[in-house]
From Swiss-Prot:
One of its GO terms (cellular component) is proton-transporting ATP synthase complex. This is ATP synthase subunit alpha. It holds the Pfam family ATP-synt_ab_C. It comes from Oenococcus oeni (strain ATCC BAA-331 / PSU-1). InterPro entries: ATP_synth_asu-like_sf (IPR023366), ATP_synth_asu_C (IPR000793), ATP_synth_asu_C_sf (IPR038376), ATP_synth_F1_a_nt-bd_dom (IPR033732), ATP_synth_F1_asu (IPR005294), ATPase_a/bsu_AS (IPR020003), ATPase_F1/V1/A1_a/bsu_N (IPR004100), ATPase_F1/V1/A1_a/bsu_N_sf (IPR036121).
Length: 520
């Protein structure tokens, strides 16, 4: 079969008409140095700060230092496959991570990739890792309580949804345990939790994940982990990745709790990166913008206005101190950024008070507006009572000849400290806390020995919960947030005390008549 030349030319013309010529220009540079999670490259004259660049082996990096002839790049992954002389090209994009409901219940690394062995995560959305915090007019005042389930916090240092509350203390004083207990208490609270482990040992993170799984808390929690064995860029980025994961839910009208455990290690990783990038060191060898490192992260936690959906993101950053020194550089920076701090005292921890919260130095600047009325009523004098107890306790060591009112204050103080002690991983609903603190502040525990206090409060809660005529007290507090008729509460506690069996009679009990006579 013969093919005519005009047919061939016609086919060629048709193909040429379909051909679309597009010119693609890539700006390519050359790697001049690589090591310790950092690379330097020349030839990327137009690269932007924070822009993603791609190395020859497919690993990505983020442009950080924009210098006259070179660009300092932090490598997002394994830098062993990158060599001097390799090509590196611009992408024109910023770093983004996958976000969405599919991330809940998973453990991911600082790039949002799963590391829990449960397969790939397929999400429909991504968010930039760096994102501008909401402005003044995009926010709303904090007014909704975030119940931690920890009596001493909910009573003395209340936290509201959208607040930034710092947890600060020496190593091994219970900072992480406090955060984990708060996460456990968010069950049935319509809350999504992001737990960011920065520089925590893999074995420690595994233990925390198993605790969350056993308690049913992993069903509403995302865990972001950057292990100490990973390069410094991973530890630096992990908190921002966690914030991006939380922001997705916040901007969709949901409530989020995010825990950064801990930001001291992020600051150390950032110092390491900055020194390798040859940025001028400042105080304690940190770079000049270390304050901005944390401020731009923590400002992303907010209570959004109704126009933006009314969602919130509450941040609990953790900072580790050395020998209780809160005046060091990083602690003072973060204290000035946050809306209050919970200070954990090593002396209290080793004396057996758990959680070891120092009520005198711990403060919540905005949480009081979010505290429920019932808790305000029963905890109003608690801080002063504790302060006067600690003062009297120090004074009482010098002599035993004390008058009756002083003895009564010391006895009440011992019971207050014992009531505020709480076992690990046993958060208490706020309505139960209110009844226990009511019994304490109204003198119902004065004739109960300190050794019986924990059993007394547990049995009191069981009694009120199980009694048909009294369980409405808990329901009323939960529904209205206010104290019901005090006659009902007094009646319930009086009835319970008739059935409560003391294991021992208190030796420090001061009868009311003795107190009154001494006052005369």
């Amino acid at each position: 079969m013969a093919i005519k030349s005009d047919q061939i030319s016609s086919l060629i013309k048709q193909q040429l008409e379909k051909y679309d010529s597009t010119l693609k220009i890539d700006e390519v540079g050359t790697v001049t140095y690589v090591g310790d999670g950092v690379a330097r490259a020349s030839g990327l004259a137009n690269v932007m700060s924070g822009e993603l660049v791609e190395f020859e082996n497919g690993v990505y990096g983020m442009a950080q230092n924009l210098e006259e002839s070179e660009v300092g790049i932090i490598v997002l992954g394994d830098f062993d496959g990158i060599s001097q002389g390799d090509t590196v090209k611009r992408t024109g994009k910023v770093m983004e991570v996958p976000v969405g409901d599919e991330m809940i219940g998973r453990v991911v690394n600082a790039l949002g990739q799963p590391i829990d062995g449960n397969g790939a995560i397929k999400t429909k959305h991504t968010r930039p890792v760096e994102f501008k915090a909401p402005g003044v007019m995009q926010r709303k005042s904090v007014f909704e309580p975030l119940q931690t389930g920890i009596k001493v916090i909910d009573a003395l240092v209340p936290i509201g949804r959208g607040q930034r509350e710092l947890i600060i203390g020496d190593r091994k004083t219970g900072k992480t345990s406090l955060a984990i207990d708060t996460i456990l208490n968010q069950k049935d609270q319509d809350m999504i939790v992001v737990y960011v482990a920065i520089g925590q040992k893999d074995s420690t993170v595994r233990t925390q994940v198993e605790t969350l799984r056993e308690m049913g808390a992993l069903d509403y929690t995302i865990v972001v982990s950057a292990a100490p064995s990973e390069p410094a860029p991973m530890l630096y980025l992990a908190p921002y990745v966690g914030a991006a994961l939380g922001e997705y839910f916040m901007y969709n009208g949901k409530h989020v709790l995010i825990v950064y455990d801990d930001l001291s290690k992020q600051a150390t990783a950032y110092r390491e990166l900055s020194l390798i990038l040859r940025r001028p060191p400042g105080r304690e060898a940190y770079p000049g913008d270390v304050f901005y490192l944390h401020s731009r992260l923590l400002e992303r936690a907010a209570k959004l206005s109704d126009e933006l959906g009314g969602g919130s993101m509450t941040a609990l950053p953790i900072i580790e101190t050395q020998a209780g020194d809160v005046s060091a550089y990083i602690p003072t920076n973060v204290i000035s950024i946050t809306d209050g701090q919970i200070f954990l005292d090593a002396d209290q921890f080793y004396s057996g008070n758990r959680p070891a919260i120092d009520a005198g130095t711990s403060v919540s600047r905005v949480g009081g507006d979010a505290q429920i009325k019932a808790m305000k009523k029963v905890s109003g004098t608690l801080r002063l009572d504790l302060a006067s107890y600690h003062e009297l306790e120090a004074f009482a060591q010098f002599g035993s000849d004390l008058d009756a009112p002083t003895q009564a204050k010391l006895a009440r103080g011992r019971r207050t400290v014992e009531v505020l002690n709480q076992p690990l991983h046993q958060p208490m609903p706020v309505e139960h806390q209110v009844i226990v603190l009511y019994a304490l502040t109204h003198g119902y525990l004065d004739d109960i020995d300190v050794s019986d206090i924990q059993r007394f409060q547990k049995e009191l809660i069981d009694f009120v919960s199980g009694d048909k005529s009294y369980k409405k007290i808990f329901a009323a507090i939960k529904k209205t947030g206010n104290l019901p008729d005090e006659k009902d509460i007094n009646s319930a506690i009086d009835d319970f005390k008739k059935h409560f069996s003391k294991s021992v009679e208190p030796t420090d009990y001061v009868a009311p008549s003795t107190k009154q006579e001494a006052n005369k």
